[in-house]
A protein has these predicted regions:
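Amphipathic helix-loop-helix modules that constitute alpha-helical solenoid scaffolds
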Residues: 86-130, 136-147, 154-327
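Amphipathic, Lys/Arg- and hydrophobic-enriched alpha-helical face
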Residues: 13-32, 45-49, 120, 124, ...
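Arg/Lys-rich amphipathic alpha helix in sigma70-family domain 2
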Residues: 68-86, 94
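"A position-specific structural signal for the A-helix of alpha-solenoid helical repeats
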Residues: 241, 245-248, 301, 305, ...
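Structural recognition of an alpha-helix C-terminal capping motif at a helix-to-coil junction
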Residues: 37-44, 57-69
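A short, charge-rich alpha-helical start-of-domain segment used by transcription regulators
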Residues: 2-23, 33-36, 186-194, 198
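Hydrophobic-face residues of short alpha-helical interaction/recognition segments
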Residues: 21, 25, 63, 67-75
Length: 420
């Protein structure tokens, strides 16, 4: 293996193993910032040694053992709890006396719990939403600051600052590296799910920039969701979120035209929908429902997505079922955005005037003042009612509000189609 091949192998190993490595070391040092530094020390050691010695049979175990040695050095340098590095030294000696497969098993025993702790810590509500997203993608997703910056159209120094500040905040607030229990678990899990879905949504419909979608972010969010489903298999809302993302991701290819332009749901070629992702999503939804989570926020949205997925054509869509699901969702989590989606469903199920009646109750809603989808939906309903002049004005207003260039082009085209 050439030096170049070795470095490529190290890059691949790091991408896969870094979340597990950071999680395992964080359990030891109880500080994810320090854990990341120790993990990078182990990476540097690999870069120095593997080109000469070759990539180990179990590179993840090698990195973990090296990271633990660095943790001992860290405790010694900081003169913290002498017993800690003595215990860690004994642990390493015991591991080195075992065969490699036994070491693998020993590491795997704890790694699931460690990863779950890392997920909950990175998504702790003491952090801002932007910080939680950046830290989760960095620590759990294994992305570089450059990759995160490019995905969210911000500068790399901005992302780096968010991550540094997040780690400092966690240390300052003495956030424990643990999985929350009891009454704290539900709100903390909600924070984790919110972060993952925010990442997915930014990939599914980019809020700004020239691209309608950023598929890599959808893939990252799906990967995080699937990991979480394995780590917390008894949580129905985790499976509900995975179901929602799987089904929505199944439409990705059909959502873009030949030139990258947006293709709306009812205009999509359903033959391009990914049937494997749909099946996976439906299985996840069934799992959520079996666990008693049919009325969860994400499970309800997944059930709505499933209605679209099961319809062979747009005309076969069960809009009355979708409208009923939105009524349930609005009762569970009242919000103007949910009401706007309910308006769309009512417009399709019971006629455009029914939808417009709902939308018109939202026109003065302060939180939707700059939300481009409000005039977009209103324009669509007005167009169906034959009120083309008003529809054109709404589409033009929506185009002025959106920050996505592709969406702006689509909205202006819809305005033009209404005539003068």
């Amino acid at each position: 293996m050439t030096a170049t091949d070795t470095h490529q192998a190290i890059d691949a190993v790091w991408r896969i193993e870094s979340p597990k490595l950071i999680a395992g070391l964080a359990r030891i040092v109880r500080d994810i910032g320090v854990a990341e530094d120790l993990a990078h020390d182990a990476l540097v050691a690999a870069l120095e040694q593997w080109p000469e010695s070759g990539v180990p049979n179990n590179p993840g175990a090698w990195l973990m053992a090296t990271g633990k040695h660095r943790a001992i050095d860290y405790f010694r340098r900081n003169k913290r709890v002498e017993q800690k590095h003595v215990e860690l030294g004994h642990e390493l000696e015991a591991e080195q006396e075992r065969a490699v497969p036994d070491l693998d098993a020993a590491l795997d025993d704890d790694i699931g719990d460690d990863l779950l702790r890392l997920v909950f810590t990175a998504c702790h509500p003491v952090l801002s939403t932007e910080a939680r997203v950046a830290l989760t993608l960095r620590m759990v997703g294994g992305l570089t600051t450059d990759e995160i910056a490019r995905a969210f159209l911000v500068s790399e120094p901005t992302v780096a600052q968010r991550i540094v500040r997040a780690k400092k905040t966690l240390a300052k607030e003495q956030v424990p590296f643990e999985v929350p229990r009891g009454i704290d678990r539900a709100p903390r899990l909600a924070s984790v799910l919110e972060v993952i879905y925010l990442i997915f949504n930014e990939g599914y419909t980019a809020t700004a920039g020239d691209d309608w979608m950023r598929p890599a972010l959808c893939e990252d969010a799906l990967r995080l969701g699937r990991i979480l489903a394995e780590l917390a298999p008894a949580e129905p809302e985790v499976h509900g979120l995975v179901a929602l993302m799987e089904i929505q991701a199944s439409r990705s290819r059909a959502r873009l035209g030949p030139a990258g332009e947006p293709v709306l749901l009812l205009d999509q070629n359903r033959a391009q929908w990914d049937r494997l992702l749909i099946r996976r999503g439906l299985v996840a939804l069934e799992r959520a429902e079996r666990l008693g989570g049919a009325q969860g926020v994400y499970a309800l949205q997944a059930a709505i997505a499933a209605c679209h997925a099961r319809a062979r054509t747009a005309d076969e869509t069960d809009w009355k079922r979708i409208a009923a699901l939105y009524v349930s969702l609005a009762a569970l989590t009242p919000s103007p955005v949910v009401e706007l989606n309910r308006a769309v469903a009512f417009g399709m199920a019971y006629g455009p005037q029914s939808g417009l009646d709902v939308v018109d109750t939202l026109v003065g809603e302060p939180t939707l003042r700059n939300y481009h989808l409000l005039p977009s939906v209103r324009g669509d309903l007005l167009k169906k009612l034959g009120r083309l002049g008003e529809a054109r004005q709404e589409f033009e207003r929506a185009a002025a509000l959106t920050r996505n260039a592709r969406e702006r082009t689509l909205l202006l085209a819809r305005a033009t189609a209404c005539g003068t």
